[in-house]
């Protein structure tokens, strides 16, 4: 494989550059990187790319039996479409579930007092379970009749 990589460099000559890192560029802290990952996860799971391309409305509306327009947050019977608020709500739930797993992982640190460990376990389980069951409720709102055993 190395001989295959060597073929272009028989013709090309690499320049002799002395590059230095700019003095203003510093390594970001672990918490900064973590925050960027969580924010990007929130935006991606919320469908920000879909929202930019398709430009859906933030909420929809439906006509009730009396002829009045009522706002709806979920685009029912459409798996491949969403309103902006629907994407943000779902993204919040996914992010909350992910943070619940991270909190559960952090509760295993050896130097945490017993009360704090219990509180972290409780908060982590609540985040994960609430996220899971609310995602099921959202699926029932999105696709009525789905998940009805």
UniProtKB/Swiss-Prot annotation:
One Pfam entry name: OST3_OST6
Membrane-traversing stretches: 33-53, 84-104, 118-138
Pathway the protein acts in: Protein modification; protein glycosylation
Coiled-coil positions: none
One GO cellular component term: oligosaccharyltransferase complex
Similarity-based family: Belongs to the OSTC family.
This protein's name: Oligosaccharyltransferase complex subunit ostc-B
UniProt organism field: Xenopus laevis
Lineage, top ranks: Eukaryota, Metazoa, Chordata, Craniata, Vertebrata
């Amino acid at each position: 494989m190395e001989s295959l990589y060597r073929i272009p460099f028989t013709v090309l000559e690499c320049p002799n550059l002395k590059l230095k890192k700019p003095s203003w560029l510093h390594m970001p802290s672990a918490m900064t990187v973590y925050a960027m990952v969580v924010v990007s996860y929130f935006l991606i799971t919320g469908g920000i790319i879909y929202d930019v391309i398709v430009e859906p409305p933030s909420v929809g509306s439906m006509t009730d039996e009396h002829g009045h327009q009522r706002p709806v947050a979920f685009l029912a019977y459409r798996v491949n479409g969403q309103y902006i608020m629907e994407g943000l709500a779902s993204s919040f739930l996914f992010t909350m579930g992910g943070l619940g797993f991270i909190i559960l992982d952090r509760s295993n640190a050896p130097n945490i007092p017993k009360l704090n460990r219990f509180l972290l376990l409780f908060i982590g389980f609540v985040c994960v379970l609430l996220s899971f069951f609310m995602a099921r409720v959202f699926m029932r709102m999105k696709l009525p009749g789905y998940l009805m055993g």
